[in-house]
Amino acid sequence: MKLEHPDRLMNRTPLSLAALETHDAFAERHIGPDAASQQAMLDTLGFASRAALIDAVIPASIRRAETLPLGPFAQPKSEAEALAALRALADKNQVFRSYIGQGYHDTHTPAVILRNVLENPAWYTAYTPYQPEISQGRLEALLNFQQMVADLTGLAISNASLLDEATAAAEAMTLLQRTGKPKSNVFYVADDVLPQTLEVIRTRALPIGIEVKTGPAADAAQANAFGVLLQYPGVNGDVRDYRALTDAIHAAGGHVVVAADLLALTVLTPPGEWGADVAIGNTQRFGVPMGFGGPHAAYLAVRDEFKRQMPGRLVGVTVDAQGKPALRLALQTREQHIRREKATSNVCTAQALLAIMASMYAVYHGPHGLKTIALRVNRIAALLAAGVKQLGFATVNDTFFDTLTIDTGARTAQVHEFAKAKRINLRRVSDTQVGVSVDETTTRDDLADLLDVFAQAAGGTAPAVDALDAGLAGVAALPAGLERTSAYLTHHVFNRHHSETEMLRYLRSLSDKDLALDRSMIPLGSCTMKLNATSEMLPVTWPEFGGIHPFAPAEQTVGYREMIDQLEEMLVAATGYAAVSLQPNAGSQGEYAGLLIIHAYHASRGEGHRDVCLIPASAHGTNPASAHMAGMKVVVVACDAQGNVDIADLKAKAEQHSANLAAIMITYPSTHGVFEQNVREICEIVHAHGGQVYVDGANMNAMVGLTAPGQFGGDVSHLNLHKTFCIPHGGGGPGVGPVAVGAHLAKFLPNQRSTGYARAEDGIGAVSAAPYGSASILPISWMYIAMMGAKNLTAATETAILNANYIAKRLAPHYPVLYSGPGGLVAHECILDLRPIKETSGISVDDVAKRLMDYGFHAPTMSFPVPGTLMVEPTESESQEELDRFIAAMIAIREEIRAVEEGRADREDNPLRHAPHTAAVVTANEWPHAYSREQAAYPVASLGTNKYWPPVGRADNAYGDRNLFCSCVPMSDYA
């Protein structure tokens, strides 16, 4: 509905309260173009209404007949109403003091980081830094993360984050399989590794033929394993000296992975110093709330020899066109978008925002501050150990950092009962033992309460904390010889921003370098960079969501589970499937889970031999990478000249592999930005040969309310809540990748048996460390759907399609639109073909992308799915004014190219070849170019009042990969 001017409302007969309330509709905030703008764009396209456009774009055979069946959420709520409804759910959660440990710990998020990173759209609305020149701020923050991890682990190089500790362990396993002992398929897991980690490892190992063995760490060298996973400290708190064991494993031809607690490594000898080949772990306790399991940034660090086999993203240092230091994503040829099924991993989205928070926690506290925190945590654990021993209890582990396992015998139930009365959670190790993991937030009063719990169970009086402290001088809880002596975090960045003033300014200086949605549209095709509304983001930092341990008792998480159930029902309605799991914490993991579900279904029918996965040539790189991880053989299906699946080739491949056909993976609308007319036929062909249909949900933003994969033949899909359902991209994560399935596949959805979470009868194993994955950001999608309601969600989809077609129509005279459906229409994105321009002018798609930075825009998706093209997706959130600004920039760039084609500009010395132009270059004393400074920096008038300056010139990618350097840069290099 178009907002009316208040004066007009005042001059009419008074409106009803209901009519006035519609003027606070959230949809009017979320959808960019108002009614007048939409009609103007429709007029440009030659349609009388949005409905007429949609009828022409989407095949009638797959149109949804009914309104989205959202039940109680069909009618939109105002922002205030939705927040109140979610607050009521949050209040059903009980925030206990959780000393469960098991990889998750309460922590203090420094307020300066909470407000200026987690709650700051300059950080959370940015995209993955594939365009380095406009991403230098978050690249520096991620480089800090890598330096922090490398220093603390004592290893050569770290990646820029993975999804969670369990996933990182599984990635380490497959890394060592690729590089290690050729005659072994055994991966050995010590029996004191986190149970959720072991379960994810088992899930990942099964389809690729790895045998997982478990047992005492001491037996690892005799296991004939290509790799061994050790926990340091162990889940029960033990800190063991693994130096001799590591030497023995190496002598036997194996490699060693260590799951290490980074805070503990400030006081313990790092694994890199005693022979570990790989270190993995979670950085959650560095200032990131527990959030019922996530999101958190995992890490993976390796010895130098493994750096080119690392999974995930890697930030490296290079130089720009002026020879100044610049940062970029390094060694991208390892990744799925390039190597497809041969990639080191299928991970696309990681946990950039959380990695940035963890790195800034280290920057803010510095090495001395971190060590002080660690020593205090260790001291509290030591006092607790002394106290429970005075009360007559024995500790299982004599060495520890922060975790005690306590023999409580027949009094175990009493201990838990008394703890519950004080709103305390302890780990239920067994019927005779409890675990206690203290943390940064544990106070003297908390310690007194813990001692009182054990005193009540023992029928005694708790010793006083001060008396314990006075009597425990000089007692060491760390093994002799394992105290850390090496320096860490010596780089200046970790030693200068310890006042809040300095930290605030440092964060501001970094965010000012970057281009995010808070500055301009980001028209990345297949990425759906839509509004992340502030009201959607607010609940993420509520303690009732952030302060919950993922393994807290069910009665403490009633509100969470109710919200999750409602969100699952919303997604079922949107997709047309029967059931959804929210456990996968990225689209890549939802995709992987979907393929495992298909395999489990075939196996349950005695057809476990079905292992062929058909994938169109145009598919996103995660598709073949995930299929390979799921143990499937990839067979490529050709696409025709229009970009559609070649039906004849599909029939031939399906017939050829009929006996072994497991699935086809298709994207809808297609990766070419078109609603293929024959999608039902594609599904029917595969079903006829016994296969299942996997519909990639990356483009769900073009389907919500209009069509549904579960209704036109899909059996399983993953969704990207960080695309369609408004979770922000965070500069490269977090994401959520739910897997949605038909009724016949529902019983195979992911479980997590190690923690008692089992929702599916024959469910596959866990694919994430926590039962509900990145649970604390699920309220974002819940809020979006609740505030939009059924009709407005459909209107958003229609507007996304309208915006894309408007751009395609306006730019078609200047750049050919490569693929379109009937009537020359596209779906929610369009592909602009720049290949003819390259032939006539020498200007590349990369040149255009860099030149767009001078105009204040992030480039569209480059060279996907077709090399030499730009894929543009504007989303429904961008206004016509912003679309016109982008169109004007693209037309102006085309005229600059035309000047090269006609000889009016030099083929080498022109504003495209030297883009982007920094302020330092434009204001330098010397100007060596034939074109003017004004043309370089202010090519259109609108930039005069709103200019973004790229902080570096064009990054030299080849130099960065040839001279790989992935640590913080000395200040002298910036001189």
Swiss-Prot record:
The modification N6-(pyridoxal phosphate)lysine is found at K723. Disulfide bonds: none annotated. SUPFAM superfamilies: PLP-dependent transferases. InterPro entries: GcvP, GDC-P_C, GDC-P_N, GDC_P, PyrdxlP-dep_Trfase, PyrdxlP-dep_Trfase_major, PyrdxlP-dep_Trfase_small. One of its GO terms (molecular function) is glycine binding. One of its GO terms (biological process) is glycine decarboxylation via glycine cleavage system. It is an enzyme of class 1 (oxidoreductase). It holds the Pfam family GDC-P. It catalyses: N(6)-[(R)-lipoyl]-L-lysyl-[glycine-cleavage complex H protein] + glycine + H(+) = N(6)-[(R)-S(8)-aminomethyldihydrolipoyl]-L-lysyl-[glycine-cleavage complex H protein] + CO2. One of its GO terms (cellular component) is cytosol. Its EC number is 1.4.4.2. Keywords: Oxidoreductase, Pyridoxal phosphate. Belongs to the GcvP family. The glycine cleavage system catalyzes the degradation of glycine. The P protein binds the alpha-amino group of glycine through its pyridoxal phosphate cofactor; CO(2) is released and the remaining methylamine moiety is then transferred to the lipoamide cofactor of the H protein. This is Glycine dehydrogenase (decarboxylating). It comes from Burkholderia cenocepacia (strain HI2424). The gene is gcvP.
